[in-house]
Amino acid sequence: MADNENRLESILSRFDADWTASDEARREAKNDLFFSRVSQWDDWLSQYTTLQYRGQFDVVRPVVRKLVSEMRQNPIDVLYRPKDGARPDAADVLMGMYRTDMRHNTAKIAVNIAVREQIEAGVGAWRLVTDYEDQSPTSNNQVIRREPIHSACSHVIWDSNSKLMDKSDARHCTVIHSMSQNGWEDFAEKYDLDADDIPSFQNPNDWVFPWLTQDTIQIAEFYEVVEKKETAFIYQDPVTGEPVSYFKRDIKDVIDDLADSGFIKIAERQIKRRRVYKSIITCTAVLKDKQLIAGEHIPIVPVFGEWGFVEDKEVYEGVVRLTKDGQRLRNMIMSFNADIVARTPKKKPFFWPEQIAGFEHMYDGNDDYPYYLLNRTDENSGDLPTQPLAYYENPEVPQANAYMLEAATSAVKEVATLGVDTEAVNGGQVAFDTVNQLNMRADLETYVFQDNLATAMRRDGEIYQSIVNDIYDVPRNVTITLEDGSEKDVQLMAEVVDLATGEKQVLNDIRGRYECYTDVGPSFQSMKQQNRAEILELLGKTPQGTPEYQLLLLQYFTLLDGKGVEMMRDYANKQLIQMGVKKPETPEEQQWLVEAQQAKQGQQDPAMVQAQGVLLQGQAELAKAQNQTLSLQIDAAKVEAQNQLNAARIAEIFNNMDLSKQSEFREFLKTVASFQQDRSEDARANAELLLKGDEQTHKQRMDIANILQSQRQNQPSGSVAETPQ
C-alpha cells in the first residue's frame, strides 16, 4: 500500500510540474478554440461596450476553412527506407500496410481533428492504439488504430523538459480523460476496473490540477519511457548457419526448446532497450501500474502550428490568435451600426400638448392610421400650429466607422489569403498557369503548418513501425494499398525453400529497422487533374493523325474518372499495351501483349509483300544469270575439247606431209589460230558484258527490297492499334 502511495505521489508531482510549465500557453490556446468555435464576445469585452445588439460577423471561419481544406487536399505520404540489413521489398510492404491503416475511418477523423486544432489553437494530437483484428477466440492477431484527442491543448500534457517539436525526446506524457459518472462506468468496464471505486474528495490534496469538480471526474493515462540494459542471446541457426539474436526476457520459457532444436548459443550481449509503460491513475489511487505496451515510443503524436520557446517556456499559436483583435473590432462596428438602425427606425415629431390633446393614442406608434388629427385651437380659442414644431433627428453612422470597418476586415483577411479562383478572374480569361502561380504564392502562407504536419506524420510513421515490430510476429495475410490506391493481398513471414541452395527464406519479413521520411505534395487525384490539363494543352499543339497525337489521346483516356468512362479507359489501356508503350502489370495485360505480337507477326503488310516480290524476282534473275554462266562454261569446255581434237588431227596430217609443204602449212595454221583467238576474245568480252548487266539489275532490285524492308521496320508499332475518333 505504501509503495502504491509513493508511486502515485511521484506521478502526480511530475504531472503538476508539467501542468504548471505549460499553463500560460495552454490557457491562450483554449481561448483561441472558444473564440473560433463558440463565441467572439469575451466576458471582459462587456465592460467596454453598452450595445444592446451584439452580432458576430465572422470572417475568421472562412480563413480557417480555407487552410484546413488546403491541408486535406495535399496529403502527406509516409515512406520507409530500409537500414541495418532490412529488405527493400519489406519496406514496400510496410508502406502499403501504413496506407491501408490510414484509410481507416478513425484514422482520418483523428488526423482531421488534430489538423483543425493545429490551425485554430496552435496544437493538436492523436494517439495510436492496438486492437484485436477480429473476435475469434483462436486468433490473437492485432492491428493498429488511431484515435482522436479532442482539445489536445488541455488534455495532453507533455514532459516539460522536452525540447523537440515531435516530442521524441519526452520521457513521459499524460493524457487526461474528462467524464461524467456514467462515463466512468464505461471507462471502468473497458479497462477492467472496479466501477464502484469512484474518486472522491475524501483525501484532501493541494495539487494544482483540478482533478475533481461537481460533475466531472478526471482520469489520466500516464506514459513513461524506460531505457534499461537487457541481455541478448546470440544463437547459430542449425539450418542456415547464420547467427540469430533473441532477448533473454522474450525466450526465457523456450530456451530448452531452442537447444533441442539444434540452436547453439555462441555469445551474449548487454543491449540498451527502450520500453514504454502505461499507468492509469486518479487523484487518489493508481488503478493500473506500469503495463508494458507495444512499441518503443510514446504512442501520442503532437502537431503544432507556429511553435517555439520564449525564456525556456514553450509557446505556440494558430491563425485565430492573430485575427482576434480585427474580428472583435469588426463585430463592434457592425453591431453599433445595426443597433442604430434597430433603435431608430423613423424620425419622431415634437408637438405642444395642446396640439394632440385627445389624440395621443394616434401617436403612440403602435397603430398605422390612414390620417392623423390635430387640434386647431387651444382652450382659449387661440390658433395652434398645424405642423410639428420640430423632429428628433436620427443618429447618423459616423464616417469613421466605414474606414474602421474596412481596416478591421482587411486585418483579418491579411492573415491568410483566400487564393484565386480561375473562373472568378476576368471571366476565366486569365491563363491557367498565371492563376496557379498566384495560388502558389497564397499556399506559402500555409507552408509552415504543412511542414509541421509533415513532422508529425513522420513521427506517426516511426511509432507505427515500432509497434509493427512487436505485434506482427507470426505469418499472416494483410492487405496493402499501393501508391495509386489499388489494393493487394500479401502474406507476411512466408517461409519458402530456395531450390538452388536448399535453404529456407522468409519473405515479407517487416521486422527490422527503417528510416522514416515524408513526401509532401498533391494527392494522386490532384496529379491526375493536372496531367489531364497538360495533355489537353499538348493535344491542341500536336497535328492530328500523327502517332504522337494518338499516344496523347490514349493517355488522356486513361486518366478519366467517374461513371460511364470505364469502357473508354479500358480501351485506351489495352491499346497502349498493344502498342508497346505501357508495360503490362497483370496476367490479363500480358496476354494482350502476346496476342498483339502474334497478330503483328501474322499480318502481311502490302509494302512488305511488294518487297518480298522484288526480292524473289531478284533471286530468280540471279539464278538465271548463274545458269547462263554455267552454260557458257560448258560451251567453252566443248570448244576447248573440239580444239584439242582438231589440234591432234592437224598434228597427224602435218606429220604425214612432205617436208616441202610443211612450211606453207605451218604459216596457214598461224593465220587460222590468230583468227580463232580473236573470235574467242570477242565472245568472252560479250559474255562478261552480259553477266555484268544482269548483276547490276539484280543489285538495284535488292537495294529496293532492302529500303522497303527498313521502312517497314522503322514504322511505329502503333500502326497495329486502332486510331480512336
From Swiss-Prot:
Subcellular location: Virion
Superkingdom classification of source: Viruses
Keyword entries, A-Z: Capsid protein, Late protein, Viral capsid assembly, Viral genome ejection through host cell envelope, Viral genome packaging, Viral penetration into host cytoplasm, Viral release from host cell, Viral short tail ejection system, Virion, Virus entry into host cell
Keyword S-adenosyl-L-methionine among record annotations: no
Any matching Pfam family: P22_portal
InterPro entries xref list: P22_portal
Main location: virion
Swiss-Prot/TrEMBL GO biological process terms: symbiont genome ejection through host cell envelope, short tail mechanism; viral DNA genome packaging; viral DNA genome packaging, headful; virion assembly
GO cellular component, one term: viral portal complex
Function summary: Forms the portal vertex of the capsid. This portal plays critical roles in head assembly, genome packaging, neck/tail attachment, and genome ejection. Procapsid assembly may initiate with a nucleation complex composed of portal and scaffolding proteins. The portal protein multimerizes as a single ring-shaped homododecamer arranged around a central channel. Switches upon genome packaging from an asymmetrical conformation in the procapsid (PC-portal) to a symmetrical ring in the mature capsid (MV-portal). This change of conformation may serve as a signal for headful packaging.
Homology family: Belongs to the p22likevirus portal protein family.
Subunit comment: Homododecamer. Interacts with the terminase large subunit; this interaction allows the packaging of viral DNA. Interacts (via C-terminus) with the head-to-tail adapter protein gp4; this interaction participates in the head completion. Interacts with the scaffolding protein; this interaction initiates procapsid assembly, thereby ensuring incorporation of only one portal ring per capsid. Interacts with the capsid protein.
Protein name listed in UniProt: Portal protein
The organism of origin for this protein: Salmonella phage P22 (Bacteriophage P22)
